[in-house]
Design a protein with these regions (language model features):
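Long extracytoplasmic/lumenal interhelical loops at the membrane interface
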Residues: 280-294, 302, 306-344
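A membrane-periplasm/extracellular boundary helix in multi-pass inner-membrane enzymes
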Residues: 221, 238-285, 294-302, 310
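Transmembrane signal-anchor hairpin modules in multi-pass inner-membrane enzymes, especially those
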Residues: 1-110, 127, 131-137, 141, ...
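Alpha-helical transmembrane segments of multi-pass inner-membrane proteins
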Residues: 46, 120, 134-166, 173-242, ...
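Membrane-interface catalytic loops of GT-C/OST-like multi-pass glycosylation enzymes that act
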Residues: 106-110, 178, 221-229, 330-335, ...
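Membrane-embedded alpha-helical segments of multi-pass membrane proteins
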Residues: 54-71, 112-124, 180-189, 227-235, ...
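Transmembrane alpha-helices of multi-pass inner-membrane enzymes
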Residues: 62-68, 190-191, 234-235, 379-391, ...
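Hydrophobic transmembrane alpha-helices and their immediate junctions
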Residues: 344-386
């Protein structure tokens, strides 16, 4: 296999793309007949995520269930020996335990049971669907195409309808398109930025242009945390693979210019990303995030060991907060770790932290062992960015956010299969 086939960014861009597609076709042809449709279905995932939550959830759930059935039929339990897999099962067990002892056990157990489809999907990607690096690269390419298709959709919305209250809503009809770019598209975005910093030839210009264009659309969506995730992830990707100061500084300057240019051309969004961020910092009662997160802390104090029950916060918050409290209820506390404390207690918090840390460390070690491969070197950034504690977040046990988030985490976890090869890049 040629050098350009071994990884991304090692040669002429068009030749690399041709090799990736041909390698994927060969890999699919080598699969057992019954497995081939599932792998093709997996590769189409980024486009299901562009439709709506129900088709996307069906895609993810079918593949997670198929992996579980396949493992039972083949009596394949080798994947259970991996540290991050065991950590996920430990966290799930604590969630089930918390739900069982809550005052609404039927509801909480149902939520805890259904949530596990997300880490199970990550296991399916790592130990089945993305085990062949040729299909892993194909999925990364599919994710990149999906990300650029989303930027095209959002560009069309800007030209046809414009922003609505400083936000964009296409193609879903609600305020979440930035989730696709920042979460589902994060593995591809990290590779794009790394290639823009350290690849050769025309690849640098094309990857830099595509990354900058999608970054501009992130600003226009008006989703602040998602923009920060992409900026920070891009910064880390730039220093994680074949780092060179001169190109890295150039990419950083271009990113800053892109963001400032959007502010200048679309002045209505500037305040949302500057003064509004400072006002919303959860440092006092004047911040709504402080009052919402504080409600989660109060729920933790109400049941510190096992919490109030998985996904129970929205149901029980009003009974926990006293009338006239400085805090207020919402569907969730808007921070993953506060939500873990509130709903699964200190045991769930410790188990959840262990699970997330195990995933990040598995990918970081794999990247260090294969530093010349851009996908392996940047994969750890995805769970680190998406689970970073100092940010406001969506519902940890919810549906739509988890579909975006775990589709990216699943793709990144498959990078543990990449092994360093002599002469690869």
């Amino acid at each position: 296999m040629s050098e350009s086939q071994n990884s991304l960014g090692g040669g002429a861009l068009w030749n690399d793309l041709q090799h990736l597609i041909m390698d994927a076709q060969v890999a699919l042809a080598d699969l057992p007949r019954w497995e081939k449709p599932f792998h093709i279905f997996w590769l189409l995932g980024p486009f299901f995520l562009l439709i709506e939550r129900s088709p996307a959830d069906l895609w993810l759930s079918i593949l997670a269930l198929a992996f579980a059935v396949r493992s039972l039929c083949h009596r394949d339990g080798a994947w259970l020996s991996h540290g991050w897999v065991r950590a996920a099962f430990i966290f799930w067990f604590v969630c089930l335990l918390s739900a069982s002892f809550s005052i609404t056990p039927a509801y909480a157990l149902g939520e805890a049971m259904s949530w596990f489809r997300f880490p199970l999907f990550a296991m399916a990607a790592a130990f089945w669907l993305g085990r062949d690096k040729r299909l892993l690269y194909a999925m990364l390419l599919s994710s990149g195409f999906g990300m650029m298709l989303m930027t095209g959709i959002l560009t069309a919305e800007m030209l046809i309808e414009g922003q609505k209250g400083g936000r964009l809503t296409w193609p879903y009809g609600d305020l979440v398109p930035g989730n696709y770019l920042a979460k589902a598209g994060l593995p591809a975005f990290c590779v794009m930025v790394a290639l823009a910093v350290s690849a050769r030839g025309k690849t640098i210009f094309l990857m830099g242009t595509l990354a900058s264009f999608s970054l501009a659309l992130s600003v226009l969506t008006g989703e602040r945390i998602n923009l920060i995730i992409r900026l920070c992830a891009g910064f880390m990707a730039g220093i994680s693979w074949r780092f060179t100061w001169r190109k890295f500084v150039l990419v950083c300057v271009i990113s800053i210019v892109v963001v400032l240019s959007v502010f200048a051309l679309q002045g209505s969004v500037e305040g949302r990303f500057t003064t509004a961020i400072l006002h919303d910092l959860p440092t006092g009662a004047s911040s709504d995030y402080y009052r919402v997160m504080g409600g989660g802390v109060m729920a933790f104090f109400d049941a510190p060991l096992l919490g109030i029950g998985t996904a129970n916060y929205r149901e029980l918050c009003a009974n926990i907060l006293a009338e006239g409290s400085a805090f207020r209820c919402d569907n969730h506390p808007h921070n993953f770790y506060i939500q873990m404390l509130a709903e699964t207690g200190i045991l769930g918090f410790a188990a959840g932290l262990f699970m997330i840390s195990a995933m990040i460390m598995s990918l970081f070690r794999a990247g260090r062992a294969n530093k010349q491969n851009v996908v392996a070197a940047t994969a750890y950034i995805v769970p680190l960015g998406l689970f970073f504690p100092l940010q406001s977040t969506a519902d940890f046990f919810g549906q739509w956010n988890n579909i975006f988030l775990w589709s990216a985490v699943a793709l990144s976890m498959a990078a543990v299969n990449l092994r360093a090869e002599q002469g690869s890049s």
